[in-house]
């Protein structure tokens, strides 16, 4: 095999590896967006007692997120978000990014002057945790934990 043939083979392998890496990152984004839809469906279900009691309204929105995964290329995508009005006060639940330090995605809850973070962890199964600030361990998200966010309303 000539040096040119070796070079061609090496460049082909490099191109295939890059395509595989790009496809893997794209799959992570698709899984992230699907996970967000499931999360927001669940949040809407948990918030239904407030809606039925006519103390809250919910509106599903779409936000545009641009982030820079480790690949170095900017990625822009549309993701679901939730706008709430609870007891006359505005709140928003918006994804921040898929690629975050220490987790596999983060969603912020902005309510009054407070902010909470939902972090997504995939090992051994997908679990969301609510954090009151960056340093706390977080509590596994469920309807009761979500209720604690809006208890001061």
Spans of model-derived segments:
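Short, well-structured hydrophobic secondary-structure segments
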Residues: 31-77
